[in-house]
């Protein structure tokens, strides 16, 4: 595994058409919205879940690519396995040894970090990659649709409806939304967790393909549209991330409400790129 030696900042742009990209449980599972601006939101937690699911699917049972935060996982049981390892048992600092065991074996721990002090102590890890909430470029229009099902759940319901057997439901969608997420990759933290260049390439692969293994009628058509990567020539970086992100302009070019990615343009001011920073479009 080759060591990560460069700080990286990136812009990830994706869209949704006729779907709910991230439901808000505090609002009846309606699409998340900034209450003051009307802009749509997708949490970092939602995006990291999709990355985890992609890695789990792509890597299967491969050594070093297990997922710590996954469906039905009992986290303290997984931490106990680290303390049962012979090398951890023999270590003078068992907490640090357990922490490194977890980083070595779980992709999402060395990538996103984890708190592992809920049972036997395996310490805490700050992941090499951090993500912001994704925010829509324009305000979104949330639509609620009534839907019907030509069946009922119980005999009692069937008797009540005299055999009509229909139930009603609701489905919330966004007609169209283009979302922008910003990400940060620390080479310094990567060296502490063991996050490697190979892990980074898998992360890019996940961002390109994760929506294709996460299809659901509820989410409509979600697609990765742009992945713009700024690479510094040093571990600590050569320019502030916000200045780099300002070089990326996403502008609406249609007159009415946008309904497709072609209603926008994405440009990069490469002339304004600071010294010792390169930019690459991976999508």
Predicted regions, residues:
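RNA-binding basic/glycine-rich loop and surface signature characteristic of RAMP-family CRISPR effectors
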Residues: 1-283
């Amino acid at each position: 595994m080759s060591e990560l030696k460069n700080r990286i900042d990136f812009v990830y742009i994706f869209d949704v058409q006729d779907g709910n990209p991230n439901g808000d449980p505090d609002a009846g599972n309606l699409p998340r919205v900034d209450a003051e601006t009307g802009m749509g939101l997708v949490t970092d937690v939602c995006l990291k879940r999709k990355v985890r699911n992609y890695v789990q699917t792509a890597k299967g049972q491969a050594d070093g690519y297990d997922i710590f935060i996954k469906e039905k996982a009992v986290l303290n049981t997984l931490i106990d396995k680290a303390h049962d390892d012979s090398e951890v048992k023999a270590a003078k600092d068992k907490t640090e040894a357990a922490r490194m065991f977890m980083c070595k074996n779980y992709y999402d721990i060395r990538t996103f970090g984890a708190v592992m002090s809920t049972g036997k102590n395996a310490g805490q890890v700050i992941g090499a990659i951090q993500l912001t909430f994704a925010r829509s470029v324009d305000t979104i229009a949330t639509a609620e649709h009534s839907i019907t099902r030509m069946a009922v759940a119980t005999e009692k319901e069937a008797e009540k409806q005299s055999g009509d057997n229909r139930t009603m439901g609701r489905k919330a969608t966004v007609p169209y939304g283009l979302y922008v997420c910003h990400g940060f990759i620390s080479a310094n933290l990567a060296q502490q967790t063991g996050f490697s260049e190979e892990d980074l390439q898998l992360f890019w692969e996940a961002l390109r393909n994760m929506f294709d293994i996460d299809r659901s009628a509820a989410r409509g058509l979600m697609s990765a549209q742009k992945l713009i990567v700024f690479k510094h020539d040093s571990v600590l970086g050569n320019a502030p991330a916000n200045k780099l992100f300002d070089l990326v302009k996403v502008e609406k070019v249609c007159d009415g409400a946008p309904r497709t990615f072609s209603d926008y343009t994405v440009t990069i001011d490469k002339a304004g790129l600071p010294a010792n920073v390169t930019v690459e479009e991976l999508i």
